[in-house]
Amino acid sequence: MTTSLGTHYTWLLVALPLAGAAILLFGGRRTDAWGHLLGCAAALAAFGVGAMLLADMLGRDGLERAIHQQVFTWIPAGGLQVDFGLQIDQLSMCFVLLISGVGSLIHIYSVGYMAEDPDRRRFFGYLNLFLASMLLLVVADNYVLLYVGWEGVGLASYLLIGFWYHKPSAATAAKKAFVMNRVGDAGLAVGMFLTFSTFGTLSYAGVFAGVPAASRAVLTAIGLLMLLGACAKSAQVPLQAWLGDAMEGPTPVSALIHAATMVTAGVYLIVRSGPLYNLAPTAQLAVVIVGAVTLLFGAIIGCAKDDIKRALAASTISQIGYMVLAAGLGPAGYAFAIMHLLTHGFFKAGLFLGSGAVIHAMHEEQDMRRYGGLRAALPVTFATFGLAYLAIIGVPPFAGFFSKDAIIEAALGAGGIRGSLLGGAALLGAGVTAFYMTRVMLMTFFGEKRWTPGAHPHEAPAVMTWPMILLAVGSVFSGGLLAVGGTLRHWLQPVVGSHEEATHALPTWVATTLALGVVAVGIAVAYRMYGTAPIPRVAPVRVSALTAAARADLYGDAFNEEVFMRPGAQLTNAVVAVDDAGVDGSVNALATLVSQTSNRLRQMQTGFARNYALSMLVGAVLVAAALLVVQLW
């Protein structure tokens, strides 16, 4: 371990936003006037520390760049010793810069977006708590500390999604997100228990060193349990249903959850645990299947959503599916998963903040059927949203082209039927993404004006537009900077490993042409449906079965209700009935017997001496009779 300033100051990454959250949440109304400024300062300070640590890492050789800081011994309990240890390596640094950088821009944007909210100070406190938890998650050097950050992110998301708690829909959405994430958290916790019982430690270094000697069955079980946790946190099938409802929170929350923090946590967990998954092919196959299914699942849902935020939420489910698919490919895909995660952070944050500007301009209206023709009224929002749109659909040379194209090529490179299925799913997802995002673009900024009478859309203030502009710049250039020359792949190689260049199932130019071809088809179909014909202000009732299913989130909630909720409720009622009739019934019967016996005995206590004398005489006769019987026997 190389001694450097990073070994002394890494803890500030977590401490600064955590201190900001503590001051804002416990300081009360005294911080109302300047609380938003403190929240932004804490986020920017964390980004500054991250930039300082990056400069420190760049000054050293690749294999010596990891920064370790043991703050204190946290849990010394027999065979279990857990240190409050922090680790910044090449993988962690990618997340630190994304979380703190994009998170800071979202903080600044929120100054304008939440300007009229009386609880703005509390909102910034929750944002700081979210940032601190996510940073702890990615800089922890062991699974226990990661789990603390994991739970902190879950708590902060619950608070932010339900921030407007006076709205029943927001309170319900917060509870739904919290409960569904508890399912994944339980899976991750059991996976950690199994990890400790197998390796005797929960530190990354100790676990990964022991992986080669472990049973493949145990590694598979651990991998599947960790995948369950990742599915909940990153909204992957079958635990994706909470993400659409999470749009009930303020729009900056959507940007923070979808772009820079929460939904990327599952991808981080899988890539960080790469040495384990590399030796558990069954678990790795499950990761690939989940990613492929989810990227199509989310894309189909996005095609039928009229609420602009819910359409973008569906796109997040799909785009995270691409990342999970890439992570499931092992060393061949880890770097591409992280590349898409980073580029997605820019263009998805830009899309959500742009949608927030549109909603702000349209007086909280979120139905795209009530938009139309907004490009003239919102020129900056239109330009920044448009650049992010080109990035997400994968038009060269925008960011998404490089990262998504790399995943498609890696999927096709898996070879055989597996490669054909995975590559086909990735290509189909790219075409559907182009369709629904073009639909969003056309319904919002083009066509006739479908505004309600009296609406006067206006551009957002500078404090909101400048973060959008910076994110648009990232949407344009980040992909090329990370991909050209294998920059990100070489940067991550000491952590995620490398693989020999496999024989491509298709030449690179063919894979790229196919990807651009399906994107062009998606754009053309969307233009034909939404660019050349009037769009009704009310969604048609008579639609195809697929559209109806997509509007209902492919019946994800109905599936959970029928498969889990109702059987669970019936089981609970049965257990309660057994408890009432059996356990409680036995206790109550015994109490009744004792009560009745005592009542009868009490009636025998008359208070008259002759009754007591008679009782004594009867007792003596019975004793004498018993003795006589014994003697005769």
Swiss-Prot record:
Protein localization: Cell membrane
InterPro entries: NADHpl_OxRdtase_5_subgr, ND/Mrp_TM, NU5C-like, Proton_antipo_N
Span of the signal peptide: none
Stored Gene3D superfamilies: 1.20.5.2700
GO molecular function terms listed in the Swiss-Prot or TrEMBL record: NADH dehydrogenase (ubiquinone) activity; quinone binding
Pfam families reported for this sequence: Proton_antipo_M (PF00361), Proton_antipo_N (PF00662)
Enzyme Commission code(s) on record: 7.1.1.-
UniProtKB keywords: Cell membrane, Membrane, NAD, Quinone, Translocase, Transmembrane, Transmembrane helix
UniProt superkingdom: Bacteria
Enzyme class per UniProt: translocase
Family label: Belongs to the complex I subunit 5 family.
Cited function: NDH-1 shuttles electrons from NADH, via FMN and iron-sulfur (Fe-S) centers, to quinones in the respiratory chain. The immediate electron acceptor for the enzyme in this species is believed to be menaquinone. Couples the redox reaction to proton translocation (for every two electrons transferred, four hydrogen ions are translocated across the cytoplasmic membrane), and thus conserves the redox energy in a proton gradient.
Protein name: NADH-quinone oxidoreductase subunit L
Record organism: Mycobacterium tuberculosis (strain CDC 1551 / Oshkosh)
Annotated gene: nuoL
